[in-house]
Amino acid sequence: MVSACASPVAAYSLPAWAAAAAGLFLFPAATLLSSQARVRAERIIYAASWVLVLLAAHQRLDGVPRPPSALLNANAFAGTILLLLPMAARRKDWVLTAGLLVCLWWTRSVGAWLGLSAAVLLHRRSVGPAAFWAGAAVGFAGLVAAYAKLHSPEVLHRVEWWMAAGRMAVSAPWLGLGPGSFAYALPAHVAARPELNSLYAHSHFLETAAEKGWPYLLVWGAGLASMLRRAQPSRRFGPVAALVHGLVDYPLSIPGIFWLFCLSTALCLPESDEGAAVRGTRKIPAAAFVLVLAWLAGAWTRDNWRADRLRAKAAESFLAASEALRPHPEAARLRAQLLLSRAGEGDDVVAAGHLERAVAMDPYRASNWVLLEQVYSRLGRPADAAAARARGARSCPMLQKLAPVRVLKGGPA
């Protein structure tokens, strides 16, 4: 909290702190869960695992080479799979386990496979010799694949991001630059190249040091080591794999995956003797305290949403006034992007109209045609999407070489 308030970009750090705090809250909360409550929590995760696998299979059959399932992208899905695999194995659901491994193969995440291999090698006694040698083979193949990519942009860019995170951590060693600040501080620590823009450092520990300071990183690392060292092998397998994956990728920077990681790690802790019971004389004050906290959190979140909508409306008003004076393709595109951020079907229809005007005024910008095709696909109008692609290809022949757009979730792909 202190790091967020003292951040040079506190407006961005405070929401990121709230997301991180929600994950940290799961550690004490999990110890208060009874055995039955823990079983129910695992059942929910188990059901969600099946949903993710089936959705990924549907996407794969639909022609998506690296299906992200319901996650941000394939890399995020890979990080989630590492946390779900041990739960499937504990329940002896080998069909789900196989499905998760197939999905992990589809993601093509070398870092995730290295994380899985490292977890297998570290748990030699519990996984058995066959799994141990299979993990060793997978790890060797992963290292070969990583070596083959050594001079590829994705590796070279990671090195730049890691070095930038290190410089940030040195510049603010005690409190860091604030949770969620990496993307906003990055331009000051790397060369001005568009391909180096990134929301995350692609390294959990370096990003933690840069955003929250070295003392926090030491406490966080020591706490995780203490909890995982005493945990049952089947419980710590997933968090260990996710942490190794987090050395070279960003899934633990995504709130939902971080919460799953925190819950998986927290369930390694023994059940508290006190349980979640509250003495009779304290029930009303405790309930009132929880309700007040919930109301404050809800009010804070509501105000953030209102502020975001007001900013969007203000920008829309300025752009509309600008176009009323002189129509411009860039203004039309920006108005469409603002509407698409609201994710309402009516907004999508209006956004399509703005994009039609943008391509009419500037038919040579390929990204406008692609965005228009995405909007029509999201609206369930494949004929219009295909027509937009054909019209765009007449002005931008490069569009003929691109694969057709497939919209998978609630926003443009």
Predicted regions located by residue number:
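Alpha-helical transmembrane segments of multi-pass inner-membrane proteins
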Residues: 1-4, 17-29, 36-148, 210-248, ...
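Hydrophobic alpha-helical transmembrane segments in integral membrane proteins
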Residues: 144-159, 285-316
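TM-adjacent membrane-interface loops and short helices in multi-pass inner/ER membrane proteins
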Residues: 160-198, 205-208, 212-218
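Structural signature of tandem alpha-helical TPR/SEL1-like repeats
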Residues: 311, 315-318, 343-356, 380-389
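Canonical positions in the second alpha-helix
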Residues: 321-324, 357-358, 391-392
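Short coil turns that delineate tetratricopeptide repeat
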Residues: 325-329, 363, 397
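TPR alpha-solenoid repeat register
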Residues: 331-334, 368, 401-402
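Residue at a conserved register position within TPR or TPR-like alpha-solenoid repeats
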Residues: 339-342, 376
